């Protein structure tokens, strides 16, 4: 991802958010689904991608199936993490690079809970307009913060009503693989600075699995979508995000993706395991 790149939902990093929505829609049709996202399908229809993203047929179709399993395990884990944060008394959350995330609409939140979604203006405009046209209303006090995470997003967040004096639940799902090392370091530093005692964060970390992103299977999907997927990822070495938070005094816990999949009775394929084996969900709390 280039330093000044902008995108909508069918270009650049935005199309990966659309792909995740496709995975959530596929999962929601299963009888044994791990998540239920009734809003993913309307978002896919409205996006009208330049090429079909059906996820059916051929080698790319097999990769879609495996991606759906991975996304479902990841989504279920973070859904449950939010539920625990709410039970602990947290009353505001920030979804970093929210994309087409619909948790502000599909999850149950305590009365008065505030969810701040940060993303590119075009991405938020598309999601807001589509769901409004469907008559969908948020199940919390939702604030869309249209700002690039490479800009002064902290000021925009506070201006939108975020209270840094209150404990916060931060989510970085499907974000860090796209950030250069310096941008990732700045993001974690800003989160720390804005986090009151009792705040927590959940991060999808695949730092050790970055080389697996360069496999031929990704080439198949890139050709199907007509986009340079490899060019979107930042493959430079960087410190582990859990270690960075621990050095700042956060209490860190790690859940390997394979263990989570087994716990949800959704074992990943050998190929998905190869990608996810070195990946983990990192959660941390600032005491």
Swiss-Prot record:
Presence of keyword Magnesium: no
Domain of life: Bacteria
Signal peptide coordinates: none
UniProt GO BP: methylation
Stored InterPro entries: Ppm1/Ppm2/Tcmp, SAM-dependent_MTases_sf, SAM_mthyl_Trfase_ML2640-like
EC number(s) stated in the UniProt entry for this protein: 2.1.1.-
Enzyme class: transferase
Protein keywords: Methyltransferase, S-adenosyl-L-methionine, Transferase
A GO MF label: methyltransferase activity
Residue ranges that the Swiss-Prot or TrEMBL entry lists as coiled coil: none
Binding residues for S-adenosyl-L-methionine: 119, 148-149
Keyword Methyltransferase attached: yes
NCBIfam families: mthyl_TIGR00027 (TIGR00027)
Role of this protein: Exhibits S-adenosyl-L-methionine-dependent methyltransferase activity.
The family this protein is said to belong to: Belongs to the UPF0677 family.
Protein name, UniProt field: Putative S-adenosyl-L-methionine-dependent methyltransferase SACE_1742
Native source species: Saccharopolyspora erythraea (strain ATCC 11635 / DSM 40517 / JCM 4748 / NBRC 13426 / NCIMB 8594 / NRRL 2338)
């Amino acid at each position: 991802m280039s330093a000044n790149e902008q995108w909508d939902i069918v270009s650049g990093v935005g199309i990966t958010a659309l792909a995740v929505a496709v995975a959530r829609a596929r999962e929601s049709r299963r009888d044994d689904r791990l998540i239920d996202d009734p809003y993913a399908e309307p978002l896919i229809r409205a996006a009208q991608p330049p090429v079909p993203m059906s996820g059916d047929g051929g080698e790319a179709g097999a990769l879609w199936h495996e991606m759906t399993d991975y996304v479902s395990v990841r989504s279920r884990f973070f859904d449950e993490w939010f539920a625990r944060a709410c039970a602990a008394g947290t009353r505001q959350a920030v979804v970093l690079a929210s994309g087409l995330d619909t948790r502000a609409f599909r999850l149950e939140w305590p009365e008065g809970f505030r969810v701040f979604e940060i993303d590119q203006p075009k991405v938020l405009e598309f999601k807001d307009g589509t769901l409004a046209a469907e008559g969908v209303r948020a199940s919390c006090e939702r604030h869309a913060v249209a700002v690039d995470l490479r800009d002064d997003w902290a000021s925009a967040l506070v201006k939108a009503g975020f209270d840094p004096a209150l404990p916060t639940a931060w989510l970085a799902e499907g974000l860090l693989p796209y950030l250069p090392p310096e941008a990732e370091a700045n993001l974690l530093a800003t989160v720390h600075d804005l986090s009151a005692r009792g705040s927590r964060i959940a991060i999808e970390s695949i730092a050790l699995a970055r080389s697996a992103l360069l496999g031929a299977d990704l080439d198949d999907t890139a050709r199907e979508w007509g986009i340079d997927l490899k060019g979107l990822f930042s493959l430079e070495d960087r410190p582990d995000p859990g270690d960075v938070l621990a050095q700042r005094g956060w209490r860190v816990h790690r859940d390997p993706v394979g263990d989570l999949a087994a716990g949800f009775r959704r074992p990943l394929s050998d190929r998905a395991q190869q990608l996810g084996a070195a990946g983990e969900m990192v959660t941390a709390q600032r005491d």
